[in-house]
């Protein structure tokens, strides 16, 4: 089975064309394929292009734990670059249907850069979702034994919990990310961003991704964090988001529609051996 591997700011995905699929892509097989010791290794799988009646292409996005994601900003940029590499698109904007909605993408600089119109950020509990009264989830508190955390919740097709802190690092994300991901307020679990505002045009985030764990970069996380900083009046509408994997430009329109632009790198392509499925289950290391 053919695969194509790309990364966007260190956030790596395998692209698999459904026409090349030789077996059902079950959650257990996804776990093995994405495992960095027993499989190819990646932050997820992009299955496409699929047929769509609503857009030019459709895409399914899978997390490394086998669950399906509604939307991934870096995944969409990677898939867009794959479509370009396969000669399926040119530099005219094109549409992609995901479980989290339809986005518009455009190839820039002869394939070096991809711009994705991510859609509109909502802070309303009914959209995210967040349990409780219908409200915008802004500056609410979660009480843990380790302290009180103030957060905002948002969705851009998938759920996010943004926590503003004075200091952030990978240890904070690894220690507290799993707690917030599965916190009872979020019935579908949530992605988590620990955010520090550097100035009115720059923020820094550490990311714990639902279904993937600690992540070097995330497009949808960048979008949610930047929108939150703008919503709180801490940043202007054009924001550089700094992550361990690199920086990305987020532009926020008046109605909180998000545009995201950065590069994508092709890493490899090859044939997946079915021998990797000899292991019955993935060992969590």
Swiss-Prot record:
Gene Ontology biological process: lysine biosynthetic process via diaminopimelate
GO molecular function: diaminopimelate epimerase activity
Record localization: Cytoplasm
Keywords, alphabetical: Amino-acid biosynthesis, Cytoplasm, Isomerase, Lysine biosynthesis
Gene3D superfamilies: Diaminopimelate Epimerase, Chain A, domain 1
Positions bearing the site annotation: Could be important to modulate the pK values of the two catalytic cysteine residues: 160, 209
Chain positions recorded as substrate binding sites: 11, 63, 73-74, 158, 191, 209-210, 219-220
Acetylation as UniProt keyword: no
Pathway(s) per entry: Amino-acid biosynthesis; L-lysine biosynthesis via DAP pathway; DL-2,6-diaminopimelate from LL-2,6-diaminopimelate: step 1/1
Enzyme type, top EC level: isomerase
Highest taxon above the source species: Bacteria
Main location group: cytoplasm
InterPro entries on file: DAP_epimerase_DapF
Substrates-to-products reaction catalysed: (2S,6S)-2,6-diaminopimelate = meso-2,6-diaminopimelate
A Gene Ontology cellular-component term: cytosol
EC number: 5.1.1.7
Family note: Belongs to the diaminopimelate epimerase family.
The protein's role, per its UniProt record: Catalyzes the stereoinversion of LL-2,6-diaminopimelate (L,L-DAP) to meso-diaminopimelate (meso-DAP), a precursor of L-lysine and an essential component of the bacterial peptidoglycan.
Subunit relationships: Homodimer.
Protein name: Diaminopimelate epimerase 2
Species this chain originates from: Nostoc sp. (strain PCC 7120 / SAG 25.82 / UTEX 2576)
Lineage: Bacteria, Bacillati, Cyanobacteriota, Cyanophyceae, Nostocales
